[in-house]
């Protein structure tokens, strides 16, 4: 083989390798996980055919669905060069709890509260869909309670009287009544309600780029810094 061709191939491999390595991922590609990415400033990132916000210093964030099965396809474009990265998603086992013999009213809410539930769900969805330019998602997240007891885990699901309920999309922490609760990271409060039907005293924080944290408490609360 001509030496010039060999040099060209080696150069192409070097450039492709450099482009691929210029994206760093902090987080595991497991169902339900949160991934923080770092790329070159000015790069364009597309994940699953959707362009993702990237900060001016190259940070971006995305999450994997609870039941995602297909690979994650990532395209990076910089200075006219396009790089494709494919990541396999690892399957995760979730806890399933079956409870039978419950009174129907404890499984399905009464019709007179349907309108209230629908209205409150819209408030929550609106707050969770905010995709601001805040950059707090880059910071380390902390536990909202010190020495907390975990009573509910992400992805778990209950089947009540044979009817599957929505999976649990968070982590429940238990503490003594009146214990101060910390925000998990810097952010802006986008929803503060004291008496929602399903979640009681509820706070939603926006950390930027579609990243939100969500708390529901026993007692009414006022966020403060």
PLM regions with names:
Residues 180-182, 203, 213-214:
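His/acidic/aromatic-lined binding-pocket segments of jelly-roll/cupin-type domains
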Residues 207-217:
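Short histidine-centered loop motifs in beta-beta connectors
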Residues 55, 184, 207:
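Short, acidic, Ser/Thr-enriched surface-loop or helix-capping motifs
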């Amino acid at each position: 083989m001509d030496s010039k061709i060999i040099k060209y191939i080696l150069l192409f491999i070097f450039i492709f390798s450099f482009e691929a390595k210029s994206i760093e991922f902090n987080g595991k590609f497991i169902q339900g996980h949160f991934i923080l990415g770092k790329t070159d400033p000015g790069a364009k990132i597309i994940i699953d055919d959707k362009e993702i916000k990237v900060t001016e210093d190259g940070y971006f964030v995305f999450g994997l669905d609870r039941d995602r099965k297909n690979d994650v396809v990532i395209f990076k474009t910089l200075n006219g060069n396009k790089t494709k990265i494919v990541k396999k998603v690892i399957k995760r086992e979730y806890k399933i709890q079956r409870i039978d013999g419950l009174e129907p009213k404890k499984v399905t809410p009464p019709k007179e509260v349907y309108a209230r539930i629908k209205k409150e769900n819209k408030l929550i969805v609106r707050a969770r869909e905010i995709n601001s330019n805040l950059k707090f998602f880059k910071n380390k997240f902390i536990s909202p309670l010190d020495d907390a007891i975990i009573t509910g885990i992400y992805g778990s699901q209950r089947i009540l009287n044979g009817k599957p309920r929505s999976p649990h999309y968070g982590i429940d922490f238990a503490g003594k009544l009146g214990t101060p609760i910390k925000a998990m990271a810097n952010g802006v409060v986008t929803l503060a309600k004291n008496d929602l039907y399903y979640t009681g005293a509820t706070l939603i924080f926006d950390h930027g780029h579609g990243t939100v944290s969500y708390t529901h408490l026993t007692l009414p609360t006022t966020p403060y810094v």
